[in-house]
Amino acid sequence: MRPSFASWGLLALLLLQGPLLQAQPLSPALQQLLSLSSQRLQLADQVAQSKAQSGKAVQDSPREEQQLQMLAGQAGSHGVGAEQVRLLFAAQIEANKLVQYRLLSRPLPDAGQAVDLERIRSRLNQLNLELLRGYAPALAELRVDDCRPRLNQALQRQVRVDRLDELHAIALSRAAGDLCHWAEL
């Protein structure tokens, strides 16, 4: 069977667009921010296990607000606005809860010994500080005309690098989905 003119035309169109679709330059600060966000999301599995063991609720509004206020208070020393920081970390928290709720909606395997939530929170605090440090450089990379394609490419790359499953890939997208908007604030 010979290819039709239409199939050759489609192939040519894809080949011509391919380089344009791949032309987004690598954004190292953005990629680092997404890597940190991904690491933060992967801790949600342990948090969910801890909450399953303890019976604690996923929603912890007082702690969330405390964290948001503390991080927003550090915004100026990291070259970003307090509102930008609140938006970033509110999205991080929501993405983390998305993972927790999904994992808790099905029986979790027995972890054996109790999960140390304080150790996990300590790691989350460390990642939060690293996210805060990397936020201004990432926003600077996103203040371009092609922000959305650049962000999408970086998200796809992070999903591949970290071999994220569908749940964590969706959560990462949720955690970073509004970065282009936040860069303009």
UniProtKB/Swiss-Prot annotation:
EC numbers: 5.4.99.5
* Disulfide feature: none
Q: Name one GO molecular function term.
A: chorismate mutase activity
Complex and partners = Homodimer.
What this protein is reported to do is described as: Catalyzes the Claisen rearrangement of chorismate to prephenate. The joint presence of this enzyme together with cyclohexadienyl dehydratase and aromatic aminotransferase in the periplasmic compartment comprises a complete three-step chorismate to phenylalanine pathway and accounts for the so called hidden overflow pathway to phenylalanine in P.aeruginosa, in which two possible routes for it exists, namely either via phenylpyruvate or L-arogenate.
Q: Which top class of enzyme applies to this chain?
A: isomerase
Which reaction is recorded as catalysed by this protein?
chorismate = prephenate
Name of the molecule in the record: Monofunctional chorismate mutase
* Broad class of the protein's primary localization: periplasm
- Tagged with keyword Amino-acid biosynthesis: yes
Q: Which residues form the signal peptide?
A: 1-23
The organism is Pseudomonas aeruginosa (strain ATCC 15692 / DSM 22644 / CIP 104116 / JCM 14847 / LMG 12228 / 1C / PRS 101 / PAO1)
**Part of which pathway?**
Metabolic intermediate biosynthesis; prephenate biosynthesis; prephenate from chorismate: step 1/1
A GO cellular component annotated for this chain's UniProt record is: periplasmic space
